[in-house]
């Protein structure tokens, strides 16, 4: 009897944590764009990039946090721009559901060292299965291709 009560209490406590706490939709390291690889509707960045570190987390309530460090070009054909963000002055995070952009953040600055952090809330459809988070470039004032993502195509 005591074992059954203990098991019931443990299950109730776990259910309470799952319902009352913030549930994670996705928590992942990020990988840099290798060059010509679109992810769903988001085109590739056009050049190879590298990333010292990156992580993204999306919670069920839409809370989104993305942080990258050392996101810079990794393409010798870019000459002196290699190892820099080369004109990419900002990034926006997009949440893809089934390959389509379901939500996108405002642009935040990308430092000359390739560092950026986004903390915001987005509205993602409740039926979004296996979301992918991509970090998109702002170059010459326009949002373009992806530079880093939580999964590769």
Question: Residue ranges of each PLM-predicted region?
Answer:
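Short coil-to-beta strand junction motifs in C2/discoidin
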Residues: 79-91
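Transition segment at domain starts
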Residues: 20-62
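Bacterial N-terminal signal peptides that target proteins for export
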Residues: 1-5
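Extended, low-complexity, turn-rich repeat/linker tracts enriched in Gly/Pro/Ser/Thr and Asp/Glu
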Residues: 72-78
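Conserved aromatic beta-strand anchor motif in extracellular beta-sandwich/beta-rich domains
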Residues: 93-97
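C-terminal motif of bacterial Sec signal peptides marking the signal peptidase cleavage site
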Residues: 15-16
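Helix-rich interaction surfaces within compact, conserved domain-sized segments
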Residues: 100-153
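Short, well-ordered beta-strand segments enriched in hydrophobic/aromatic residues
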Residues: 64-72
């Amino acid at each position: 009897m005591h074992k059954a009560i203990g098991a019931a209490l443990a299950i109730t406590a776990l259910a309470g944590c799952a319902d009352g706490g913030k549930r994670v939709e996705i928590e992942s390291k990020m990988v840099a764009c290798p060059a010509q690889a679109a992810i769903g509707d988001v085109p590739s960045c056009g050049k190879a990039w590298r990333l010292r570190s990156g992580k993204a987390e999306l919670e069920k309530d839409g809370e989104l946090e993305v942080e990258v460090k050392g996101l810079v070009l990794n393409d010798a054909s870019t000459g002196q721009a290699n190892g820099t963000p080369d004109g990419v002055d900002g990034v926006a995070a997009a949440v893809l559901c089934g390959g389509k952009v379901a939500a996108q953040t405002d642009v935040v600055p990308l430092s000359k060292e390739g560092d950026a952090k986004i903390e915001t809330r987005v509205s993602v459809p409740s039926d979004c299965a296996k979301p992918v988070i991509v970090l998109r470039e702002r170059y010459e004032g326009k949002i373009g291709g992806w530079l880093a993502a939580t999964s590769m195509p």
